[in-house]
Amino acid sequence: MKYEPVKIERKWQRYWETKKFYHTHPSRKASEGKAKGNYMLLTEFPYTSGNLHMGHWYAFALPDILARYLKMNGHNVMYPIGFDAFGLPAENAAIQRNISPNDWTEDNIKQMTKQLKSIGTAFDWSRVVKTNDPQYYKWTQWMFLKMYEKGLAYR
């Protein structure tokens, strides 16, 4: 019998995905006795400037372990992943490659998603946040305007 990690990992990753094991289940309420408690874990969003590296996993490992531990102990855990997709470095990299900044960003998000899924992270992939999504940044703009109106944002 030969150990084939890629084959075995893919098998279990497909199983977890079909069972929606890492999805958040908002209907599981602690008050109904279906979950021991609700938790939300959030890691910093990787900047979409290229491939992930070991430093990214270093930042994700402890929250990933905690998400798994809480889930295995009956807690409802929301553990989304996001991508920090705005900034001059990404725009400049896209211009240097003669492609649109949006295409550059989306390609990097796809690559990072593939990398993160391949190592079996416990993220809830049904709750991906992308800061370049208008449905996301319209709210950050709204919050900034409210802070500005109240004198909390100034030059």
Which residue stretches match the model-derived regions?
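N-terminal, positively charged nucleic-acid-binding surface of large information/translation enzymes
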Residues: 1-29, 33-155
